[in-house]
């Protein structure tokens, strides 16, 4: 089942602004050999949600401000993206790609005004993204769940769906959006940290219920993952997950997969 959606006028404006920015030949934010890869990831964030691209744009603007203040012009992937926000494919691409170029200090100092102007422009894009509180893609997700669950009821399958997204910012937004649409009961989040308030409460109850048993490994990261999967299996209806749930987690009891964000590698879809 594939559902089409039409972005709102503000979403289209944001897309055009960011896309136009990325097409410029003389960007201050990333001038090195990894520009193409960084641009691809930015477009992925843009396609994920306004919340995902807003935080990324602000992070790039912050790095530009630091560049002017400190004179440190060496670019690293973590200057642009939070580590947890990078998928394994994106991390691998950075690791296997050529090293970033380092600007000469005397050349960079002559471009400080341009760097400041670009940082201000990026913050303007981020402000526009923040102003878009409702994403049309998320609206369509509610319709997709309703149609999907109706089909599951028709064939007698368990009403459980997992939604995959690349961004924890998008994950947080979708959780709030689905709660407002009436999907709050049985909603669970799964990501690399699993430290949301709801996840911590599920983990606390799971530890109490299994105290003295052999399910508890004593490894908090592993036990948190197990607690969330058990909750989803026994009580949940919808899990919103990042790539962390795509590997090494048994979710065969789940009846429906929603690819909210598509991965670069088509094999990832099969793994999901």
Label for each model-derived stretch:
Residues 59, 167-201:
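Conserved helicase motor "Helicase C" RecA-like lobe of SF1/SF2 P-loop NTPases
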Residues 168-169, 238-244, 264:
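Conserved helicase core region in the C-terminal RecA-like lobe
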Residues 265-272:
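Conserved SF2 helicase motif VI
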Residues 120-147, 211-216:
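Glycine-rich phosphate-binding "P-loop"
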Residues 14-17, 21-31, 132-168, 172-177:
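Conserved interdomain hinge at the start of the Helicase C-terminal
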Residues 1-121, 180:
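Inter-lobe connector of SF1/SF2 helicase motors
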Residues 188-242:
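Conserved helicase ATPase core of P-loop NTP-dependent helicases/translocases
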Residues 249-261:
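A short beta-strand element within the Helicase C-terminal
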